[in-house]
Amino acid sequence: MDLRPELPTVSSASQVHPGAAAAAAAASIPVSMAGNLLRGPPLLLRAADKYPRTPKCARCRNHGVVSALKGHKRYCRWKDCMCAKCTLIAERQRVMAAQVALRRQQAQEENEARELQLLYGTAEGLALAAANGIIPPRPNYEVFGSVNSESNSESSIQKYELFPKTQLSGSTTTQKSVGKPASTESDSAPGMSSPDGRHGGGSGSENGDSESFINSPVSKPLKDGEETPGSVSSLGSDSGSETDKEEQEPSPSSAASRHMNAIDILTRVFPSHKRSVLELVLQGCGKDVVQAIEQILNNSGAQAPNKAGPEETWTAERMLQSAQQPPAGSATAATTTRPMLPGAMTLSNRSAFSPLQPNAPHFGADPGTYPLGTHLGLNPLRLAYSAHSRGLAFMTPYSTTGLMPTLGFRPPMDYAFSDLIRDRTMLHKEQGYASGLYGPLVNNTPDKQ
């Protein structure tokens, strides 16, 4: 619509008569434009409507009936209709319900995550994640550094020291006494062990293995200047071979040096034992230093160092016999294979499945020996189990009827050989239980003197 030709006429008419000019302008505007100017916005018209729009039933609308939805769903006449339009409406309702349920679940999960974050905070969450292994720990939490690191203090190394300083110095002297080929091989050891040291410093906090644990005491003598790199090469190659034992087998030279170190440790821990005996025990234990030390302590703990020659050889044979036995899978099976040494088993560490020594009051002798007379003609195997020990609680099916397993028993020799030995042994009269089979504690009768 173009109003340009009409503008001059309007201006001229306004100059002639103002009322006529206004009438001419109103007559020149089209009717559609006048209607748009006089009509209000649609929101105002809907708000001004007398009857607002209410939701209607879709099934009824499909069938040409208009009905309000409020209170109508249960009583709709087409609620079970299976026509195409009603089926489409049912599918739409199902999809909308699934979407609403999914949104509710997502909102609930977000709220739970927000609550956990507010509850634990950022620092605690990182600490828990690092403890669970999700996030690698930070470098300032590292306890053990590499072999060549100078940052670790003397106190932190002393706290986690595996071998004493004297043992390390002693082992280095023996390494020096072996010969010069060890030093020539160790000249190239720092170059080869430097990546291992860097690897141990980087992965010690991630893997938490014991290789960096072993490396930390080695770095202390290296910093003090007491030893050369050749003397440390034995322990360095030892820890390096343990680090890479999953990938490749250790070399024979490293195995020999490990064996020599084990022998040196055993000789310094047990200076009273012969080196050949210690080598046999270590070989029987599969070159395990800890197991060999346990065997020697269990077998020779209660014996004096100044024993006679035959007694010492007998102890060595017993130690070798116990060391050559195969390692058992469980603790109870391991206790069955331990040999019985005189005086080695006291009341505090007796096992239920190992033979016990006879009681001193019953046989009138020192508990560290077997004081059976030669006139009895009995070997020590007849003395199966003691009378008052907790080991009999497990052996009652084999010794007695087992009615009261935890109380005192008569000794086996007291009733097994009552007609033959009771008058000839050195049994005390007050120790014999004449009131019954199980003694005064079970029969509730005073002991007859």
Curated annotation (Swiss-Prot):
> What is the native source organism of this protein?
Xiphophorus maculatus
Report any Pfam family annotated for this entry.
Answer: DMRT5_DMB
> Of which family is this protein a member?
Belongs to the DMRT family.
Stored PANTHER family: DOUBLESEX AND MAB-3 RELATED TRANSCRIPTION FACTOR DMRT, DOUBLESEX- AND MAB-3-RELATED TRANSCRIPTION FACTOR A2
State what this protein does. Answer: May be involved in sexual development.
Query: Taxonomic classification, please?
Result: Eukaryota, Metazoa, Chordata, Craniata, Vertebrata
> An example of a Gene Ontology BP annotation on this entry?
sex differentiation
Q: Which gene encodes it?
A: dmrta2
The DNA-binding region ranges are 57-104
Name the UniProt record assigns to this protein: Doublesex- and mab-3-related transcription factor A2
Q: Name one GO cellular component term.
A: nucleus
> Which Gene3D superfamilies does the protein's record reference?
DM DNA-binding domain, DNA helicase RuvA subunit, C-terminal domain
